[in-house]
Amino acid sequence: MCYRAHDPKWAFTSTSGAGAAIHGGRFNPKGVEVLYVALTLEGAFLEINQGFALKFAPCTMRSYDVDCDDLADLRTEGGRQVHSVDFNDMACAWFSLAAAGTVPPSWQVVRRLMGEGFAGVLVPSFAVGARRDWANLVLWHRSDRRPHQITVYDPKQQLPTDQRSWT
């Protein structure tokens, strides 16, 4: 089970990575669609608020069922060694580097792992205030079917199917 807090106007696209592709993120270069989900509820709130845990914009919380193969687990030093990833490359100041026209080391890691056939990564949370054991799942390849399955938990079909719910 994973979690994500969404802007309510995008409630109908719970597994899309289009928003992340607009500006890029720590683990996705600009133009690369990716879905970031937290492994804890607390982590999901912290991620959407970028460390401002006591003040946040309206959001809708989702839980997801995940059954995904081809993940690189980078949460531990041992896992990072298996995949030849340096923690400092993941923890880089990706936004500042990208804004200065430099390719962040975290994007280089992503491109290499994608080229090796990975669908995503399990990574520590880098949000300000995150506990050391909080982590995220970052999926470049996802579907509503195996082997890269992620589905939003919505047993009563309450989520809208388009943006007309907000007009």
What are these regions (language model features)?
Residues E42-L54:
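Short active-site loop/helix that positions an aromatic residue
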Residues L39-G43, E116:
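Conserved active-site and cofactor/substrate-binding residues in soluble primary-metabolism enzymes
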Residues P29-A38:
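A short, exposed loop/beta-hairpin motif centered on an aromatic-Gly-Thr core
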Residues V37-L39, V123-P124:
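Short His-Asn-centered micro-motif
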Residues M1-I22, R26-P29, G51-T167:
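Active-site and NAD+-binding cores of ADP-ribose-processing enzymes
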